[in-house]
From Swiss-Prot:
Its EC number is 6.1.1.20. It comes from Novosphingobium aromaticivorans (strain ATCC 700278 / DSM 12444 / CCUG 56034 / CIP 105152 / NBRC 16084 / F199). The keyword Protease does not apply. Residues 39-149 form the tRNA-binding domain. It catalyses: tRNA(Phe) + L-phenylalanine + ATP = L-phenylalanyl-tRNA(Phe) + AMP + diphosphate + H(+). Residues 703-795 form the FDX-ACB domain. Tetramer of two alpha and two beta subunits. Its cofactor is Mg(2+). NCBIfam families: pheT_bact, YtpR. This is Phenylalanine--tRNA ligase beta subunit.
């Protein structure tokens, strides 16, 4: 909200300067966006008198002026203004000055062969109005040589960010009230005298919609002259960013911006019958003042007469009943509209206005008569005329909230001990009535004050938030305990591990198109949003993979050659009773080239299912899963390639992860070309280890003795998974065998049909003493025996 310093001083008797006002407003919670001083741009322009004006020798529409700055050294200036003449006092821009309207820097130059040492300026060029038919004409006694900024005087414009909870500050008077309470001046009483009507109101005014419009007041003023408004009024409106239109319109805008009271003026000659606040009817429309026609719904409140709708109530007036220069009789409307109804109507019509911004926050219901008196007295003063009696339809909600308050709450809640007398002074200055028993009556213009904590806020912000004492937080002795939960620590661990493996974290939408979500639902019920941000994002994700696949597609289509993305987040399923069931997951997408083409590597190598498996096992290990006990089994899901995917399970039913190549049909659905490897870890299913909540890892002591490796080659049925054989070998001697890995899988010559040869490297770690041959043979026998339980034979 914008207003000038002079406007503020018209309602606040203060000696504070603009800087102090701006600082105090911010400390009161009315944050200053900017303070603009238009006169600052006029310091390079001077008051000057035209001594002579002669015709330009080379141009019919130009004159050569001799201009005096009062120093006895006239300057030659070429000017094309039709009103330039000898004796005129105007404004001269000297070389080096910057024209506010267009940013042009003035220079000494030759115009059609005649030297010009500056420019005589118009109102528009100086950014002071729209007049540009001639140069500015100042009074003849204006002091020559004075900067135009000093001649005009400084009138800074404040731009204040009003929060939604402060409708009382949507007018200059409300802001002045806060400043007065803070000690920066004395609030002037509202200069509104009650005007008695000299004749009955000729227009019937009523409300047929007490829910949307509880109170509707009106009066007619006849015999008005609707010309331009006075300069002081135009200056106020310009400072607020408003364009002066006519006296009647400008007066209603002045009362709205100055006192937070929107009103509307109708041309009586354009009305037909009674003016009624009612619900809109099916199929009705309104051509608003912005030139757009709006279709109305039956629950919307409108102002209408016998001919139809004239006004979208509380938001914008209609075009065909507005006032013009020919208006002689005017109907003033001052009403109270229900805030929720105004907000709903504005949202439905996508229509904003200054009036809507005030009505939907809540205007003062007790200000109807005062606001109407203000409008009437200003119109009679500026436009003349004769006022009718006031017609009052309905009753505004005038009941004031009474709150039981304890002044000790200022210290308990606000942290400042404010004397009871000072609290009573502050509240009184803000319009609150405080009884002896500290029952506080809330003013009608403060709908945001609902309880004692709100009263504390009023006291503290006016007393000064800078008065809150600085108190250090208490520190506990010793080392502070970690505050992260085990789930948070797990998430951090896995995130660091993924990043350390060269994966790039992505954060994608939790909402998905329904078709994408359905591909990953796996029989679970999808969880749809009742009010989605768009129709394409109305389903919560049942998996993190769709979002990552879309991100991979966008990156590949923009030239990326190797995609290594991961995301940690929650998948959303429909739980019992239709509630959301959120589960922590991690997903990885590998696409493009695993190894780029090069002279050493040859052709580019794509990612495969084993890359996905390696990522899954590494991340599960970091998450604390017992990877040595996991079984590799199929049935990863229809989204995966059936022959190049698997699951990692703890037992036959507990799936901790699934990995593998994406099914070609799924890849095509996401517009992905080439092989794509994916991983999905279900972090919520990983069993918690003892001490999982501890931050530090257990102490690691490196072995004192050297490890020993032994290789075994087993002939086994081709249907036996290598992982099963590897797990059997590891379990042969859990104390001595610390690692085992498959390093060869051979099928062909020398191996019977239906069999395969698996070569396994086993790492043995002595503890107390080195292994001798007997110990090594005993361990080897255990390994062979364990493998034999799966039908494997040692290959000779």
């Amino acid at each position: 909200m914008k207003f000038s310093f002079s406007w503020l001083k018209s309602v606040l008797d203060t000696k504070a300067d603009a800087k102090l006002i701006a600082e105090k407003l911010t400390s009161l919670g009315l944050e200053i966006e900017s303070v603009e001083d238009a006169s600052a741009a006029l310091k390079s322009f001077r008051v000057a008198r035209v001594l002579t004006a002669e015709k330009h020798p080379q141009a019919d529409k130009l004159q050569v002026l001799s201009v005096d700055l009062g120093d006895g050294n006239p300057l030659q200036v070429v000017c094309g203004a039709p009103n330039a003449r000898a004796g005129l006092v105007g404004v001269l821009g000297l070389p080096g000055a910057v024209v506010p309207a267009n940013g042009m820097e003035l220079r000494k130059s030759a115009i059609r062969g005649v030297e010009s040492n500056g420019m005589m300026c118009s109102t528009r060029e100086l950014g002071l109005g729209e007049e540009h038919d001639g140069i500015i004409e100042l009074p003849g006694d204006a002091p020559l040589g004075t900067t135009f900024a000093d001649y005009l005087g400084s009138d800074p414009v404040f731009d204040v960010a009003i929060t939604p909870n402060r409708p009382d500050c949507m007018g200059v008077y409300g802001i002045a009230r806060d400043l007065a309470a803070a000690g920066l001046g004395v609030l002037k009483p509202i200069a509104a005298q009650s005007v008695a009507g000299s004749f009955p109101c000729p227009v019937e005014v009523r409300t047929d919609d007490p829910e949307g419009c509880p109170a509707f007041y009106g009066r007619v003023i006849r015999g008005v002259r609707n010309g331009p408004s006075p300069k002081w009024l135009q200056d106020y409106l310009k400072s607020a960013g408003q364009r002066p239109i006519s006296a009647l319109v400008d007066i209603t805008n002045y009362v709205m911006l100055g006192y937070g009271r929107p009103a509307h003026a109708y041309d009586v000659a354009k009305l037909s019958g009674a003016v009624v606040a009612r619900k809109a009817r099916e199929g009705e429309t309104c051509l608003a003042l912005n030139g757009k026609e709006y279709g109305l719904q039956p629950w919307m409140t409108v102002i209408a007469d016998d001919a139809g709708v004239h006004d979208i109530a509380g938001i914008m007036g209609g075009e065909h009943s507005g006032c013009s220069d020919e208006t002689t009789d005017v109907l003033l409307e001052v009403a109270y509209f229900t805030p929720a109804n105004i907000a709903r109507t504005g949202q439905a019509l996508a229509l904003t206005s200054d009036a809507r911004g005030r009505f939907e926050r809540g205007v003062d219901p007790a200000f109807l008569d005062t606001g109407l008196d203000l409008l009437t007295s200003l119109i009679l003063e500026i436009c003349g005329g004769e006022a009718s009696e006031v017609v009052r339809a309905g009753e505004p909600p005038l009941a004031r909230k009474a709150l039981a308050y304890d002044p000790d709450l200022a210290g308990n809640l606000g942290g400042i001990d404010v004397a009871a007398a000072e609290q009573k002074r502050i509240l009184g200055a803000l319009g609150f009535d405080v009884a002896d028993d500290w029952t506080v009556a809330v003013p009608t213009w403060r709908p945001d004050v609902a309880g004692p904590p709100d009263i504390v806020e009023e006291v503290i912000r006016v007393h000064g938030l800078d008065a809150v004492p600085s108190t250090p937080l208490p520190r506990a002795d010793g080392v502070a305990k970690p505050t992260a939960t085990p789930a948070q620590m797990l998430e951090r661990r896995v995130r660091r591990a993924a990043a350390s493996r060269g994966l790039h974290e992505a954060v994608t939408w939790s909402f998905l198109p329904e078709a994408e979500a359905a591909r990953f639902a796996d029989g679970e019920a999808l969880w749809s949003l009742a009010n989605p941000i768009s129709e394409d994002l109305k389903v919560m994700r049942p998996s993190l993979l769709p979002g990552l696949l879309s991100a991979a597609q966008r990156n590949l289509h923009r030239g990326a050659t190797s995609i290594r993305l991961f995301e940690i987040g929650r998948r959303y399923l429909r739980g019992a009773g239709g509630a959301s069931d959120e589960k922590l997951s991690l997903a990885v997408v590998l696409a493009g080239d695993r190894i780029a083409r090069g002279w050493a590597s040859g052709k580019a190598q794509p990612f495969d299912a084993f890359d996905a498996k390696a990522e899954a096992l590494a991340l599960l290990a970091e998450a604390g899963a017992p990877v040595d006990n996991l079984q590799v089994m199929g049935e990863a899901g229809p989204q995966f390639h059936p022959g190049q995917s698997a699951t990692l399970r703890l037992g036959p039913k507990q799936v901790l992860a699934r990995f593998g190549m994406l099914h070609p049909a799924t890849a095509r659905a996401f517009d992905l070309d080439g092989p794509v490897a994916v991983v999905e870890l279900f972090l919520d299913r990983i069993p918690a280890k003892k001490g999982a909540g501890q931050f530090a890892r257990p102490h690691y002591a490196p072995p004192a003795l050297q490890a020993v490796t032994r290789d075994f080659a087993f002939l086994v049925d081709a249907s036996v998974p290598a992982g099963d054989l590897l797990r059997a070998v590891k379990g042969a001697d859990k104390q001595a065998i610390v690692a085992a890995r498959v390093f060869d899988d051979f099928r062909g010559q020398g191996v019977a049909e239906g069999q395969k040869s698996l070569a396994i490297e086993v790492t043995l770690q002595p503890v107390d003493k080195s292994f001798d041959e007997a110990a090594l043979k005993a361990i080897a026998d255990k390994v062979v025996a364990a493998a034999g339980k799966l039908g494997a034979e040692l290959r000779r």
